[in-house]
Amino acid sequence: HRDMKQVPGFERKDVERLAGIDAREELARHNQELRKIYTFVRRKNRKNEFEAAYIQCFSSIREEAERAERLLKETSYEALRRQALEEGQICHGEYIHHNLLVAGGHMTVINFEKFSVDVQMNDLYLFMRKVLEKQNYDARLGRKMLKTYSEVRPLRDEELEYLGIRLLYPEKFWKLANY
């Protein structure tokens, strides 16, 4: 990420066309989808095991999701995003272990099909979420990942705040409900 901005040849129209989805809009849409699914499932006469569990835990998950949406609106995210677009910060879009090749002490990132110009913390968030899901949300590992990342590219307070809000959002619950 340190070197992934101000790509030569990018013009303003390119940045606008390649801009990622505004996280405020994304969380609002996800929350709307969660409510829509809840309404649909609640109206069903016969619920399967997943649907019954969804209804049972929806209230607490909804509170968590709405809190993340509210916090994002109250932070400096808008300025963070504006800066990312002005600087032409490149996000991979799918920065997960499947797209990282390590050989001979060097790492190569592949598959940039979903790249965008956006807040680079989105990539770190996705990577951390995927790794931490597989490691039972080990907080020590999360701190170590942040420390290691910060040694290469120091994180500003507003970036850490944004990352924390993204990690707060019940993304896995939303994904399960939608698929």
Place the predicted regions along the sequence by residue.
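Helix N-cap / loop-to-helix initiation motif
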Residues: 155-159
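Internal "kinase-insert"/substrate-recognition segments embedded within catalytic cores
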Residues: 1-10
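ATP-dependent phospho-/nucleotidyl transfer catalytic cores
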Residues: 10-90
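Active-site acidic catalytic loop and adjacent metal/ATP-binding pocket
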Residues: 70-121
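Gram-positive cell-envelope targeting signals
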Residues: 1, 45-46, 61, 107-109, ...
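Active-site activation/catalytic loop segments of kinase-like enzymes and analogous catalytic loops
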Residues: 121-154, 167-179
